Every structure is written in C-alpha cells, then in structure tokens.
Regions:
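Conserved beta-loop-alpha segment that forms the PLP phosphate-binding cup at the N-terminus of a helix
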Residues: 1-28, 43-47
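Short acidic, glycine/serine/threonine-rich loops at helix termini
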Residues: 14-17, 45-50, 93-96, 121-128, ...
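PLP-dependent aminotransferase-like
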Residues: 24-78
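Active-site-proximal loop/turn and secondary-structure-junction residues that shape catalytic pockets
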Residues: 40, 88, 117-119, 154
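Active-site phosphate-binding strand-loop segment of PLP-dependent enzymes
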Residues: 66-115
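Active-site pre-lysine segment of PLP-dependent enzymes
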Residues: 68-70, 94-106, 118-147
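Active-site C-terminal subdomain of aminotransferase-like
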Residues: 131-231
Length: 231
C-alpha cells in the first residue's frame, strides 16, 4: 500500500494527485479543491498548482491547531482533499486528525496526514511519555484517513532522498499511479513524479531502520524529549 518517494514535497504532491483522481472517478468532481490550514506545508499549494486544484485555506486557533469550525465551513461538494498535519512545521503542533478526517469522510473526500516530521517520532513518543508526549490517534487507526506521508530522511535518520506515502488500501493507492499504453513504446506505468529512480536512498534507509530498530528509535525520541524538557 505504500510508494517510495524522494522527499516530503514529492509525497505530498502525490497525495494531491491521488485525491484529485479519486474525486474525479468516484464523485465526478470537475473543480476540485483542497481544504487546509494556513499552517499546512507549502507543498500542498505546489501540488494544487501542478494539478489544477483550488486551495481553500482556513485559520488556526490560539493553540496553533486548525480552526475546525472554519474548516467545516470550507469543506463542500468540490472538496477533493482535506489536510491534517502531524505535526505542522511552523510550531510543531499536531492537528485534531480524527475531527478533520470526519469532515473529509462526510463529503467522500480524501484525508491526508502530513507526518513527514512526526512519522518516526509520534509512535515512539507515545510509548516513552504517553501522558506528556503521547498524541491522540493520528494515523490509519483513525477512520477517514486515506493516506499518510512520512520522511525517513528527517527523524528516521536516513540519508537524504527517502520518504514514503502510505495509502489505506490498494484501491486508493491506484489513484496515484499513472498508467498509459497509447503510444508506440509499450505500457508506461509510474507511481510518482519520476520515471527512472535510484534505489540507493532507499537501500540506505533500509539499512538505517534495520540498524536502529524499535529500541533505537525509542532511545532517540527519549533523548529528544529530555532535551526539550531541559530547554
């Protein structure tokens, strides 16, 4: 259910494309929109620019999470994608993912969780400090979340050029794939924006993940938590 990409931007842009294709195929949406907080990563706007979606930005509240009332007002029949961040980049705050996913599901839209920063932190923070650092459910355990992105080359500690996008199902994943057989060269199928890709970044990421393992990531997250507490 996952595809490998070269970084957060590519993972996010692929999520935008998949959401647009799903909205077209399943709901006949012709003027697709993305609903996202003003704190969401700029790559969502890049994806909207590349794939012809309108963005509907909503404000954040005093605690830097998305204003759910404003988001509910922005979601509608043209919504292809609703965005949650875990965490968002500017302040490091996790959005209320369950509530956002519910808004998306209410109109049949996709919900992408940008966990490019938190994907290799939140699972282990919840183990180490469940009361102080644990977060409400933010991943595919949340009904209505259709895809997640996580960067191996950020707090997964792998070399640059390694990210993943994980879809809830194979059915949803196929909306990300470009499949074309209308030319003289045969079938052309790509799961992301690139054609030819090097396997080196993912081989290096695999080695790092195997080396660190669950215990290694727990130690690193514990160290980060202790440092944050001291600061």
């Amino acid at each position: 259910r996952q595809f490998r990409t070269r970084g957060a931007t590519e993972s996010i842009v692929c999520a935008v494309e998949a959401a647009r294709e799903r909205a077209r195929a399943e709901r006949s949406v012709t003027e697709p929109e993305i609903v996202l907080a003003e704190s969401a990563h700029a790559a969502f706007h890049k994806g909207a620019h590349l794939f012809g979606l309108r963005t509907r930005m909503v404000p954040v509240t005093d605690d830097w999470t998305v204003d759910l009332d404003a988001m509910a007002d922005a979601v509608g029949p043209n919504t292809a994608l609703v965005v949650a961040s875990a965490p968002q980049y500017p302040q490091g705050v996790v959005d209320p993912v369950a509530e956002i996913a519910e808004l998306a599901a209410g109109v049949g839209a996709s919900c992408h969780v940008d966990a490019c920063m938190g994907g290799f932190v939140l699972p282990f923070a919840s183990i180490e400090e469940p009361d102080a650092w644990g977060s409400p459910p933010w991943d595919l355990a949340v009904e209505g979340v259709t895809s997640i992105s996580a960067d191996l080359h950020k707090l997964g500690y792998a070399p640059k050029g390694a990210s993943v996008i994980l879809h809830r199902s194979r059915r949803l994943r196929r909306y990300q794939t470009f499949d074309f057989d209308g030319w003289l060269g045969g079938r052309y199928v790509t799961p992301n924006l690139q054609g030819t890709r090097s396997g080196l970044p993912m081989a290096a990421a695999w080695a790092v993940v195997r080396h660190l393992g669950t215990d290694g990531y727990r130690r690193l997250v514990r160290s980060a938590i202790e440092t944050a507490d001291r600061i």
